[in-house]
Amino acid sequence: MSSGSDGLSTIFGAELRKLRARERFVLDGQRPSGLVSESIIQSWERCLSRGRSTHECVVPTLLPKHALKHSLRRSQKIFDAAEPELRNLDAALTHTGCVMALLDPSGVVIHAGSEHPASGELVRQWCRVGVDLSEEAMGTSAPGIVMQSGGAAQVDCAEHYFAGHASIRCAAAPILDWHGGLAGILNIAVESRAFGFDAKEIVMTYAASIENRLLRMQPAGYRLIEFHLATDMIGSGFAGLAGVRQDGRVVWINGVGARLLGVSRAPNCDVETIFGIAFDVLRMSDETVLHRLPNGLTVCMSISGSPAHGPAQMHSAVSRDDRLADQHNRLILETLAANDGNIARAARRLGVSRGTIYRAMGTSGSR
């Protein structure tokens, strides 16, 4: 038997085991721990508690026109933030058979990607503007789990609660607003085939970029701190962001920022506690600088004035790359000197490649 056939047999066998596990769970209450994720089991439990049968014929239905109009109007801000990334993602999925959709916090599709020739009929029905993909409407699905758990999810074939959805695979990720609430959900789905790539990772990446664009549109009266380990991430959709009130309280931090800082996304602490620099000092800076955080990480950091003008100011700051590069190289050379010229040790200390050290040395020598 060919390796391709072996792979198909493995996939089919895994899905068959999940299907049987779901039936045993519904009929006998046996929890298939280890075979499917806990979030999926919990979704099955909720569907079962609503009195739903796995053999119901559940098809996507459209919201009434007046309800859809209200949903689209309410979601205009997130659509504006998402539109550039939705175009990019739609183009990337052209030859995959996948369809993508942007959902509002209630699970209603507010934007659907192009219907590519390889896309299946059922998945095209799922990803139509106005379709309700919430758990109450469609049972277990990636968007439904995102709404319940707040985290990214992937649901494959027999993991869906309703048997009629077993040909679908879907992956979804949340998009949060500046209060940490759910602003929207990004979903991609495919029918009667495997994704062929890490769908969950891709949807998380695009959702994070959309979230950053949305966060930059925060209400007036806040300052925006942007930071990252890498210089070229400043001004991108993948930088750490923090929203700061005029009194210096940090009221929200995006996911990247929270991971860099080692804090929660809603710390409600002052800037100095979180970043190790006084707010009055930071807000006087009009350029991107290198700064060492309280946890020891050295990051590039910038603060904008009125968030309404944040992206323009950030672009202006980032355009002064020469001064930032000088600081970057100086930090590398100081660390190299402190390690007696040991390049490998300095690279480990800074968390950079040895090539970065060599480039900094070459830049210094050419001046």
PLM regions: where:
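Intrinsically disordered, low-complexity terminal regulatory regions
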Residues: 1-137, 141-157, 167, 176-247, ...
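PAS-family sensory domains
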Residues: 110-111, 261, 350
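PAS-family sensory/regulatory modules and their coupling/dimerization elements
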Residues: 158-159, 167-172, 273-319
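An active-site-proximal beta-strand-loop segment
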Residues: 162
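PAS and related sensory helical modules
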Residues: 261-271
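Bacterial C-terminal helix-turn-helix
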Residues: 322-367
